[in-house]
């Protein structure tokens, strides 16, 4: 594939993603908090700091990976980096493969660091890149963490995608052992299982982003790029973010779990934190905001999102993220069936 074709593919991904709409129904709607009428705290008591062994985020919300590798996406990364700088959010760039292959593309990613020199930035590579390239990806952005995206359904629907996956787990193990910053194993919208969590724990992984279905749909994106558009029947493949977080429960004491995929509102973010996530990521909502409404409106959107999270936590009488994990939740029969059939051990306060 030529560099021009790769740039074109990057642009197609963003164009199709922006055209997708939020799911009408979400598993976040299948879980409810129990309301208690009189809080014992004030809004000003809320501490939204997200603390993991290696990363401290001012807020448990981050701009998740989407873009880079073309001139248009350079402009998007530039604007998102300004939003991150002005709001204190962490930010992940899209796959840096284009820059690792072609130095001419490096600026489409490094613009994020240029515009946000003191901020928290995650670099991003695929599970098949050599260790040396993973190290380069971290150095390229002076990144505080490295996402490794695992996207086998996307690759298999992508006309020119990868068809070989046997080496992925061993390669991830090599990268984790060599890279000095936290390595986050990131799904791309298909969710994670307890079996995968076991395998990742065995090779020393300490961070995952479960990225469940319900948000940006890469099966749909790649199917749109197929000549016959003949794999639309896989549109609903995978676990939701709620199901994925439940799948991780037994591993949350040893692996820091981030949640993304289909988060629509501050309440969805709070529900993710209550299920054990340490932070929540969104990509398309920020992408649409910054492209359609500009930087200032996107900053205001983020500030409002954070304030709404504080209001919800006050209603729940939760001073911090750890308190949220003790709050009572009522699940729908469908989610309870998932828990039972998957033999998940869910204990709450």
From Swiss-Prot:
Cofactor(s) required for function per UniProt: FMN; NADPH; Mg(2+)
Residues that hold FMN according to the record: 65-67, 95, 124, 186, 211, 216, 262-264, 283-284
Top-level taxon of origin: Bacteria
One annotated Gene Ontology cellular component of this protein: cytoplasm
GO biological process: isoprenoid biosynthetic process
EC numbers on record: 5.3.3.2
Pfam families: FMN_dh
Record: residues binding Mg(2+): 155
Enzyme class: isomerase
Gene3D superfamilies: Aldolase class I
HAMAP family: Idi_2
Family membership noted in the UniProt record: Belongs to the IPP isomerase type 2 family.
Known function: Involved in the biosynthesis of isoprenoids. Catalyzes the 1,3-allylic rearrangement of the homoallylic substrate isopentenyl (IPP) to its allylic isomer, dimethylallyl diphosphate (DMAPP).
Family matches, as PANTHER family: ISOPENTENYL-DIPHOSPHATE DELTA-ISOMERASE
Protein name: Isopentenyl-diphosphate delta-isomerase
Lineage: Bacteria, Bacillati, Bacillota, Bacilli, Bacillales
């Amino acid at each position: 594939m030529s560099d021009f074709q790769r740039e074109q593919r990057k642009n197609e991904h963003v164009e199709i993603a922006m055209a997708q709409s939020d799911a009408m129904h979400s598993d976040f709607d299948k879980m409810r908090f129990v309301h208690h009428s009189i809080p014992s705290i004030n809004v000003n008591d809320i501490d939204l700091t997200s603390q993991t062994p290696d990363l401290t985020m001012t807020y448990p919300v981050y701009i998740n990976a989407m873009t880079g590798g073309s001139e248009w996406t350079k402009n998007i990364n530039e604007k998102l980096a300004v939003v991150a700088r002005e709001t204190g959010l962490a930010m992940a760039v899209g796959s840096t493969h284009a820059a690792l292959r072609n130095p001419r593309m490096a600026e489409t990613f490094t613009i994020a660091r240029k515009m946000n020199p003191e901020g928290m930035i995650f670099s991003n590579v695929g599970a098949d890149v050599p260790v040396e390239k993973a190290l380069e990806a971290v150095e390229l952005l002076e990144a505080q963490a490295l996402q490794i995206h695992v996207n086998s359904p996307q690759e298999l629907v992508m006309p020119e995608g990868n068809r070989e996956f046997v080496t992925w787990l061993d390669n991830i193990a090599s990268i984790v052992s060599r890279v000095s910053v936290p390595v986050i194993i990131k799904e791309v919208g298909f969710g994670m299982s307890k079996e995968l969590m076991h395998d990742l724990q065995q090779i020393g992984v300490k961070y995952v982003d479960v990225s469940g279905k319900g948000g940006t749909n890469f099966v749909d994106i790649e199917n749109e790029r197929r000549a016959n558009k003949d794999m639309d029947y896989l549109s609903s493949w995978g676990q939701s973010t709620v199901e994925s977080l439940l799948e991780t429960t037994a591993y949350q004491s040893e692996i820091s779990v981030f949640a993304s995929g289909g988060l629509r509102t501050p309440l969805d973010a709070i529900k993710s934190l209550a299920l054990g996530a340490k932070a929540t990521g969104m990509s398309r909502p920020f992408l649409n905001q910054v492209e359609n409404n500009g930087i200032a409106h996107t900053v205001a959107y983020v500030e409002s999102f954070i304030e709404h999270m504080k209001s919800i936590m006050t209603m729940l009488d939760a001073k911090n993220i750890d308190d949220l994990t003790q709050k009572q939740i009522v699940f729908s029969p469908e989610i309870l069936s998932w828990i039972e059939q998957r033999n998940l051990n869910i204990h709450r306060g």
